[in-house]
Amino acid sequence: MSFERTTPCGVISGTACQWPGIAAYKGIRYATAGRWESPIPVTHWDGVYDATRYGACCYQPRAFYDEAAAPGKAFYYNEFRKGETYTYSEDYLFLNIWTPADAAPGDRLPVIFYIHGGGFTGGCGHEKHFDGPVWPTKGCVAVTINYRLGPMGFVCLPALADEAGSTGNYAFLDQLAALQWVRANIAAFGGDANNITIMGQSAGAMSVQQLVLSPITRGLFSKAVMSSGGGVSQMLTAKPAEAHYPFWKQVMETAGCSTLAEFRALAPARLFAAWDAVRTQPQFKGLGCEPVVDGRFQVKTGPETLAADEQHHIPYLIGFTSEDIVPPYLYQMAQDWCARNADSYSWFFDRQLPGDDRGAWHSSDLWYWFGTLAHCWRPFTEKDTALSAQMVDYLTNFARTGDPNGADLPQWQTVTAQQTDFLRLGEEPTHMGSVDVQKLLWTMQNVPAVGE
């Protein structure tokens, strides 16, 4: 079978996927960018683009890929990255596509565009928990992306603002460029450019939050999913870019750079070392790698945008796990966000993953949403397989129509002022039910989080 397709950029060749009848197109360059410059979209290539292997990941702290570098990250390293090999570079603006092998232009399949988490400092678009999502077997096109991380993606300096008219938010400009590339090219993979659902977890969910608040992303997507982050989040309310200048000036000084040209030419390892040394200083708490009001991607703070009712009015799914980072806070965020938007649905995941570290901790639901349980070392049972299949059905139904409900699925009700229950996914049969916020608060205060 040929995996060649003709896109507006040129001919591209993919490869078979672990799922029968599914084709994968890996490492597609969607843009190029100089350090702390806006991404330039890729619109053409010569010859046949080889999309049979993943592209490099964004340079990131060793804690994300070296087990010995940071014991505090060992849990997540063992869960999601152990045994994997990644390449790290400053040339990393790649995306990946999975689609039915027989999908043709004009099929107009719904598209799920996934943004990975990692605290805006780590991760990539082909970690093993979403390497080969099952969604195309349900008639959806899957897309994952890389974007700029850490100091690569968030530096704010007056010299950069003078140069380009704005500074900061480079990570989000990458996500915007990837969305624009998908809109322009996804029909060649059988996808519907007018039916794109953006989805993210943790920092990826916070990215979704920023995308639905931005005035320059309208028309690029029609639905949104936020897992363990995002919503009406005071944790990530964008500050003016100027508020971050002292932090990044200190990083620049710590790196021994006196000019922007020197800072741009600094080796990545030295840049990340300087950033790491400064971010732990108490006077810079709450500054660094986060969204800013730059006058371009974001022109208002999140609360200002919501007060003006200028967020995207589209269907939303939003939820969290029972042992998440700050579950009571995420609970309130989910309720507040859904109450502001019609056709919004919230979930609560409490499945205790099997193993010697049982729990429904932050990120534990990813294996289920992507249908990639087989990639994990854990002794999953038939119950886990059935739960994952159910969650995938809800998600792909939502991507298709904006309503997660379907035949043979327990009814998932929208959130309203009168209906505040969550869809409970996990230990009990799936059902609508309340969440004991006091129990979540007790757990957060008394039970150590994984990795601690």
Predicted regions and their residues:
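Serine-hydrolase-like catalytic core of hydrolytic proteins
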Residues: 77-254, 305-327, 337-342
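Substrate-gating cap/lid region and adjacent catalytic-acid/histidine neighborhood
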Residues: 223, 230-238, 254, 258-385, ...
